[in-house]
Amino acid sequence: DVLIFSCYIWNIEYVRELAAEFHKLRPEVPIWVGGPEVSFETERFLKENPAITGIMMGEGERTLTELCTSFEQESSLEKIDGISYRRGDGTVVVQPLRSLLPMDELPFCYANLQDFEHRIIYYESSRGCPFSCSYCLSSVDKKLRFRSLPLVYRELQFFIDAKVPQVKFVDRTFNCRHEHAMGIWNYIKEHDNGITNFH
């Protein structure tokens, strides 16, 4: 068993408390976290939260897959980039950051879902932000990446065909590339099924 949390500004305190309580009940179960609230200053976060075993830094798609494989095979964590973890003796190891995947290589995680009747789907056609707002974590890395429009169209059509009631775009700066945003909106307009609402 392993317990894994995604940490954001709105849930980080709950995750800290829950991890500490869970660790009291099941100290043998590793607890891992990831997300924007824990990807920076990982050594400090681990020292302040002794119940947490490790942190996935940055984007988690490839890291989580490798981490789960490591747990299944009971292999060393030392070959996994993008993690920070506590060894059995308490020392903290910080592995090198993982390079960002091209957007088209990120998995489409909805293909195997069947029942969409009461679901809200969160979808990203891009990641990153070109701006430098001092209060926002997005300003740390100004890389802006896009899924190719043909791939986005195929994925949107999947939602339309499945009659998903609500699809929410979670792109940080959806309209910063005009042709990308307009391509998506035109596709949605031309393929409207009268059921799927895109937000």
Model-inferred region functions:
Residues S76-E78, S99, F116, N193:
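A generic structural signal for short, non-catalytic loop/turn and secondary-structure boundary residues
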Residues Y8-I9, P36, L100, G128, ...:
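Short, surface-exposed acidic/glycine-rich loop or hinge patches that mediate macromolecular interfaces
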Residues E41-E43, E48, I80, R86, ...:
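Surface-exposed loop/turn and secondary-structure junction residues enriched for glycine/proline
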Residues F40, V92, L101, K142, ...:
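Flexible, glycine-rich phosphate/dinucleotide-binding loops
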Residues D104-H199:
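Radical SAM [4Fe-4S] cluster-binding motif and immediate context
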Residues V2-L97:
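Glycine-rich beta-alpha loop elements in corrinoid/cobalamin-binding modules
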Residues L97-M103:
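A short, sequence-level motif marking secondary-structure junctions
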